[in-house]
Amino acid sequence: MAGENSSTETKNQEINEKTPEVQTFETNVEFESSQKVESDTELSADNASIDTDIQSTESTSKEKDQVLLKEAYELLQTQLETTKYQLEEKESQYKRLGADFDNFRKRTQKEKEDLDTQVKCSTIMELLPVIDNFERARSHIKPANDGEMAIHKSYQSVYKQMVDSLKRLGVSVMRPEGQEFDPNLHEAVMREATAEHPEGTVIEELVRGYILGERVLRHAMVKVATAPDTDAETENQTDPES
């Protein structure tokens, strides 16, 4: 026991006997250790602050990116709608132009056809009196000898060629006899009271009529049946001389 107390006293004495230089060094070491701890603490705080700033910056950057992406999407959507509208307008214009051109083509074609028909009608109308003369000659002239028969056949051959030419042009002859009178086709130049035909029936063609397609070149001049005069028939039946 006495030995342990002696050892402790010896250590305390050694400590007390340290030189001022040693004490100063130890003090400096302790100060530097304290400074290092404080520096490490500040560094940790700085690192934490930097991490927070980085996270905040990243979050802000993401938000900006999202805003920019949304704006870009909306811009593209607007451009798409505008392009779609312009495309529809162009398609509509194309259809209108196509319809206008088609109408123009049809109108031009119809005008051309009408002009061709008008010229054709005018030319044929000039030939119809010649046809009439040939038909009158055929009806009234009766060849009396071989010479006259040869002449008759010669001009009848010309007449036939003209009729065939008219047929090729689309001209057709009216056959009104026995039909009901139609003012669109016929011209009544004579009327005859008769009980043999219904009233309004064409009983004779006096001048031939012609049609080109659906157009009347010349109305047929006809004689039309009318109802008999019953009073005149009664007088004839009661006349003593009959």
Swiss-Prot record:
Places the protein is found: Cytoplasm
Keywords annotated in UniProt: Chaperone, Cytoplasm, Stress response
UniProt keyword Cytoplasm, yes or no: yes
Pfam families named in the record: GrpE
One GO BP: protein folding
InterPro entries: GrpE, GrpE_coiled_coil, GrpE_head
Summary of subunit composition and partner proteins: Homodimer.
Family: Belongs to the GrpE family.
Record-given protein name: Protein GrpE
Organism: Trichodesmium erythraeum (strain IMS101)
